[in-house]
């Protein structure tokens, strides 16, 4: 933005605020919005491809060779699972900093975590998010935001309404269509679309929603899920490209490159529909105090979901011994000082050496 002068600082800050407000991966959504403002829908697509493909291709290649690695390098792959323990713990602390300073947000996060641990299911997660928004509306405070210059070259309001309607239609209709058809590709698309549509906070918060979609169905084992999640920390790009790995290793048909493509498009499609659909209304919507309070409540609720996911499946599937606890703790501390790829490589090497 600074070099090419595509947006001024305030417009860029507004885009970031919008993408933090919406469900989905904020970094990818910012890229889509910039591409949209520069080149319309084609610009948004090209921006998404440029930002997403490098990490997606690396994770797909890893997924295609995963079962070979699992047989030959089981201990090394266990190191990836220990990395996931450290990464999720760090994400909880990072998300928790603005939450723990307010007892109401802390209580909401704790209640959400307890409900998610006690009653683990996708529908409970959806209920927790909805309850978080309602609790935020009633209990939390809003803050005054100043109006700013609108972002240029965005769709009109009619187009925005069509895109938002498409988002909600797919969210409601896909589960019914997939269930009636029994088609695995449709079920796969529905599962990843729903995960992409319901993840507030982006990044690591997608973990519990994806896990509830693919592991109970038997498409991916817990071991595959956590090893892939650990590998996703070692590649550049948005964490949502983890979906490409899951589609590639899925036990259904298609898997491989086709399954990866279905999962990848499905998990990012809600972000595109929401960003392009809400941009025409954002400058007015962001100033409404009830909207601010609802989003604060949702953020506290998704923190609770992440805490629940940290316990199960992350810790319960990864920690087997005191050595695992020490290695995961060391990885957590190293993440404070070193880039994530370096921590992934060092943890995997140590796990492989000491487990053999």
Regions found by a protein language model. Give the residues of each.
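Multi-pass membrane proteins that catalyze or facilitate reactions on polyprenyl-/lipid-phosphate substrates
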Residues: 1-22, 33-356
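N-terminal cofactor/phosphate-binding cores enriched in small/glycine residues
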Residues: 25
């Amino acid at each position: 933005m600074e070099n090419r002068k595509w947006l001024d600082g305030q417009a860029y800050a507004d885009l970031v605020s919008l993408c933090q407000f919406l469900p989905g991966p904020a970094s990818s959504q910012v890229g889509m919005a910039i591409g949209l403002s520069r080149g319309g829908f084609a610009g948004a697509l090209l921006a998404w491809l440029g930002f997403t493909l490098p990490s997606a291709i690396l994770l797909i290649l890893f997924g295609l060779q995963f079962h070979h690695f699992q047989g030959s390098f089981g201990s090394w792959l266990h190191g990836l699972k220990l990395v996931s323990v450290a990464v999720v713990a760090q994400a909880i602390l990072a998300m928790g900093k603005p939450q723990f300073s307010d007892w109401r947000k802390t209580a909401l996060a704790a209640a959400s975590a307890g409900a998610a641990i006690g009653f683990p299911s996708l529908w409970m997660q959806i209920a927790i998010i909805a309850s978080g928004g309602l609790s935020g509306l009633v209990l939390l405070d809003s803050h005054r935001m100043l109006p700013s210059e609108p972002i240029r070259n965005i769709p009109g309001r009619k187009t925005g309404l069509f895109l938002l309607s498409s988002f909600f239609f797919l969210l409601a209709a896909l589960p019914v269509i997939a269930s009636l058809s029994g088609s695995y590709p449709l079920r796969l698309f529905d599962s990843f679309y729903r995960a992409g549509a319901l993840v507030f906070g982006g990044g690591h918060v997608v973990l519990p929603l994806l896990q509830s979609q693919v592991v109970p169905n038997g498409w991916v084992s817990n071991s595959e899920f956590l090893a892939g999640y650990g590998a996703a920390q070692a590649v550049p790009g948005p964490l949502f490209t983890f979906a490409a790995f899951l589609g590639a290793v899925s036990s259904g048909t298609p898997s491989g490159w086709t399954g990866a493509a279905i999962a990848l498009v499905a998990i990012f499609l809600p972000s595109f529909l929401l960003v392009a659909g809400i941009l025409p209304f954002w400058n007015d919507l962001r100033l409404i105090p009830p909207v601010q309070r609802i989003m604060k409540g949702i953020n506290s609720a998704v923190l609770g979901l992440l805490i629940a996911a940290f316990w199960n499946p992350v810790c319960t599937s990864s920690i087997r011994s005191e050595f695992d606890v020490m290695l995961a703790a060391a990885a957590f501390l190293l993440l404070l000082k070193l880039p994530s790829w370096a921590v992934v490589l060092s943890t995997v090497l140590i796990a492989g050496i000491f487990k053999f």
